[in-house]
Amino acid sequence: MLNIIYVVSLILIKFIFYKECNNNNNYYLSNIELYNYKLRKRNRILNNNINDRKSFLSDLEQNYKPLFDIYELSANFEKRRKELEKKTKGEENEIEKKKENDLEEKKENEIEKKKENDLEKEYNDVINLLELSLSSEYKELNADVSNNDNSGHEENNKHKLNKKNSSNYKNDKSLDELIKGAILKLKQNPNIKNKNMLDYDKIFKIIKEKLINKNLASNKIKGGDNEKLKEEKKQSDISTNVEVKKDIINDQLNKGIPTKIENKDDMINKESNKEDITNEGKSNSLNNLNTLNNDGNIITKVYDHYTIVTNSNDILNDISIDASDISKNSIGGINIPFNENDNSSFTHQRYIVLSNNGEKKYKIVLMTKNPKFMDMDGIYDEEEKKESLIELNQKVNKEENTNLYDGTGTLYYGKKSKKEKENTQQKGGNNPNVDINILNNNNNNNNNNNNNSNNNSNSMNDEEINYNNNNNKESPSMFRRFINFLSFSGNENETEDTLIYHNKNDNSYKNKKEGTGKNNDNNDPNNNNNKKILLNVDKLVDQYLLNLKNNHTSKQELILVLKGELDLHSKNMKNVINNAKKNLEKYFKEHFKEFDKISYDISTPINFLCIFIPTLFDMNNMDLLKQALLILHNDLHEYVENWSFSSTYHTYEADYIKEQDSVYDRSPKKKYIKASKKLYNNKYSFLNKFLNIEPLILFAKKLNSKRSNIEKEILNFLPKELRDYSTWNLSIIRVFNAWFLAGYGNKNVKVCVVDSGADIKHVDLNGNLYIPEYNEKYEMTQDFYNFMVKNPTDASGHGTHVTGIIGGVANDLGVVGVAPNITLISLRFIDGKKYGGSFHAIKALNVCILNKAPIINASWGSSHFDVNLHLAVERLKYTLNGKGSVLIAASGNKSNDNDISPLYPATFTFPHVYSVASISRNFEISPFSNYGHKSVHILAPGHHIYSTIPNNSYKIFTGTSMAAPHVCGVSALVYSVCYNQGFIPQAEEVLDILTRTSIKIISTKKRTINDSLVNAEGAVLTTLLGGLWMQMDCYFVKFNLEKGKKKHIPVVFSAYKKGVYETDIVIAIIPIDGKSKIYGEIHIPIKIVTDVNIPNFQESPRRGKNYTIDSNEAQHDEVLSYICENALYNLYEYDSHYLLASVILFFLALLSIFVGMIYMKSRKHSDKKCSKNLMKSNYIPEMDDGMEETQQLQQERRQYFRELFGENLEKNYDQHFVQDFGQDFRQDFKLGSTPDLKQYSDIDLQNKIQQPERKTVKIIINNFEDRKKETKRRLLKGLNYDGENAKKHDFTNESISNSRKNFKFSNNTEMKKNTIKSEDVKIASDDNVNKAMNQLDDMFMK
């Protein structure tokens, strides 16, 4: 109905605006056909009526090429720039290295030469000093020897010769002692530098030789010593000159010359750091730095407020930017105080002005890149040291912009907020001093014995393990436990049935014990702010028996949740797990002879331990099972956060009726509610068009046939598959527009489908399905790997159908998915009966984490709350380096309220979990779908969805299992845009984008949190233009900038989170000539500061500079404008603004119809011919007696007035009638409008009608004369006084009828005949006569 109202309103508006429509019926009918086409849009099957389709698609693809390929073009341009930069740097580095090597050799030679000179100088100084000190003593010694030699005779020469030899020996001995004594004195001399490093043996030899050969010593010793020093230089200790080396090295470091001690890698790193520092200074400089760096074909030019990177000087010369109002280089940043209640509003606005000063025409495409967010939580606490933003920015780890999803994933807890870490410590998750307290019920022993035994066996520091029993209540009997088991329910108020973490001084356990009923929040396991609630041994036994009853298996899976930061592969943890296994095996072998061994399985990094317990127990020996569990707990209690047996999950299809799991009643919990839909302020909103008359005028003036056929052209450009089946599910979530804006997705983005598997050979899935290779980190056997990962055979077809909805390939065959160009990972955990256990689900989630999948689809669930799965899903928050993974879950198909009867994992209260309900073709929540205004987030198509099934087939399925994949596909498109921009978004932010861009659905009752439908176009567009921090209007995604034109681009900002956000607005510039290879990008850095605790924080003005938009403003792109405006004319977008506009238009339409009817009526009465025919129709030949008598009376009264006032009625009316009856009397009886009979004044009725008796008329006149004396008030009340006696006459129905009988006419038969001849009757027309006639008519009728 609303569609019809809206379309009819638009038709009427067009009719009002265009007068020529009245004369052009074909045009009007063609417009009605156009609107009718829009009304039938939801059920259409696409067709192709274009003859020259090949050329048309080529033109259309060329028109959209900047949108489809802009990211690839930008990435290739950046890759080329880096290659050229690397190549140029490589060549420069080689030249620099060669220069450095030459310089280094030269410096080394100089250093060696200097060392030789210094060493030689130092030795010469020491030797000269010793020689000078020993010369006098040595002369005395030589003098004595020479005197002895000259005395005596020749005969005594032999004796003298012998004596000389003996004296020389004595002299040598004395010389040695003399030199040694001098050297000893030299060592004690404080003026000698490095005296301890000198080679004194060498000095001894040199001094001795110089003294002995005094005459030749100066030349020989100098040459000989130099040669010996050169030979012994390499063998001598370089440490003799440490001080000299230190001075030289310091001089070189001060001059920036690399020394020999530095490694080559250090030198390269040092140079690269210098380059980074230099470039950083240039990019952030506030001075006018017009530096030009031409790296091959890539030119980088840095301006005050932005940077241009291009391969052509034409762009540098033609394009100019004014970014002074927005760039962080000019204004430092935009300060917006964070407010939780207003974080969804865009409150501040700035402008970017782009101008084309050249001769070419350019295509402009806008996007954002390299966003960074710094959480300031706790940084500026009073107790901590305050740091500047520059210091904080230096601490932020830079993420690589390539291979974001490659490698092996893990869980990263380092980015926990301060509050999360405190909560974790309180829960005991990361605190080694926190212990598990067992509240055990032992029916065989009394309470005191239990407390004593457990306090003695388990204690840890100040914490105690208490086996607390309620002394006022007896333990449940065997019969009662058996009844509870058969009823599949437990007692919520049994505090004995829980295990909780608590500290010694914590009163939470006491408060919990005192609280009762559902109103106690501590009973709710979903409350993350409370202590962890753990099942005790008795509950585990009940779970074991229940699973044994429902599933006849040889083993049951006991899953233990270990602390997240433990390394299960460490030697210590392996020993702990093996010891626990051996103790458990020993206990089983003591009681069961047929038992062999126990197997277990671990899952890291999710840190789950699964122990397969054999089905050896039943109701008769469950005490043995209880004791075995206590043994296991005693070995692992220091490392365990929770434990329970595996639960069962089922898929959500509409034909599912019976729930197989036991219903574990839980108190209703307020779901984590996303922010309400408030994407833009009214002033800057895309939705502002609803309240603006201009779009309506533009719509009314849309006469261009090309523009009117744009939608048809776009539809024909879509994949061929869409023309072979109904696309209502893709149409209503606006996937087609999303594809035109950002393409079909990105292959690097992985979506993990945890379901019943998939047909990996399906023609529509094979191109996108990815089978991870076997990895030891999967920690599964080869058979298990084949079952879950390598060959996930889909027996039910459910998983294949879900996978096709998410990412069916666009290959002109079959169907196409929401995101046709992404990577799909199908993991099987559901068996052929559509059921699966929590152990397999957790193993599948672990594989998703290891493969870095940011999106996980869960079209399954259970009403049983599983703590293990709860913790596994919680740890998805810490994947992808703390960014988190999104879990999209189906809400269920039982038409229940999930707020009261929750289904898991859809109602897990985590910000990265998203619950999806189903919507039908009528835009109403499907009758089978679960709902919940506190627990279900969004709606998606889930009714009669056509998708893939095994064996290359297709089928229509219905259920919320089909709704969740649509949201998964839209999430994949959002992640693809983020990948193209070079970053991984926060999981919570992705879901917030889906929520805020969703399409509002009109409903009489609130059924979900937002009552809105997922909107692929809005989500992609919001991500494309800056996300929830910053937005630009849709029209500026792409436009043409012609010669001499300008474009003012408004940008709005919001304080989405508390912290500091930075990004780059990138404006891609492409010549309109498709053959040109010119390309350029403008990078404008943006900073948004929202933390008011930052020093010197002051809110920025809400508006920046004022700009005037004139006739030189560039026009919007035609096709893109249609996509942007389609939000107004799209019949599926039901927003509150849309509803208001529709209602206003509807009333305007009704008013227009009413005015038109009045106008046409007046025109009809003014027509002479139509008025005559209307008068003729008043005289009906055949009538009853009453009507006949009335017509006769009217004719006789007319004749009477002609006789009374004469032929000139206009002249005598006031003279006779007004004077006789009075002015007041005339107004009293002017009770109705008088028809215009002036045109009939020339008609004479005397020959047609017999004259009435004068007596009858006199009776009327007398009555009027009596009434003349009475007041207006009494006359209106219908009172009549007779003459002077004022006798009252009663105007009752009886009196009126009697009065009518008093009128008698003559020649009644002839009058009737004359009346029948109505064609000849003409009434004299006079205004005064008509007024009097009508007054009398009213009087007679009363």
Swiss-Prot record:
Residues 19-687 form a propeptide. It catalyses: Hydrolysis of proteins with broad specificity for peptide bonds, and a preference for a large uncharged residue in P1. Hydrolyzes peptide amides. Residues 1-18 form the signal peptide. Keywords: Autocatalytic cleavage, Cell membrane, Cytoplasmic vesicle, Glycoprotein, Hydrolase, Membrane, Protease, Serine protease, Signal, Transmembrane, Transmembrane helix, Zymogen. One of its GO terms (molecular function) is serine-type endopeptidase activity. This is Subtilisin-like protease 2. The gene is SUB2. InterPro entries: Peptidase_S8/S53_dom, Peptidase_S8/S53_dom_sf, Peptidase_S8/S53_subtilisin, Peptidase_S8_His-AS, Peptidase_S8_Ser-AS, Peptidase_S8_subtilisin-rel, Pro_sub2. Residues 85-111, 143-171, 415-474, 500-531 are annotated as: Disordered. Belongs to the peptidase S8 family. It is found in: Cell membrane; Cytoplasmic vesicle, Secretory vesicle, Microneme membrane. Residues 430-474, 518-531 have a biased composition (Low complexity). Residues 688-1137 are extracellular.
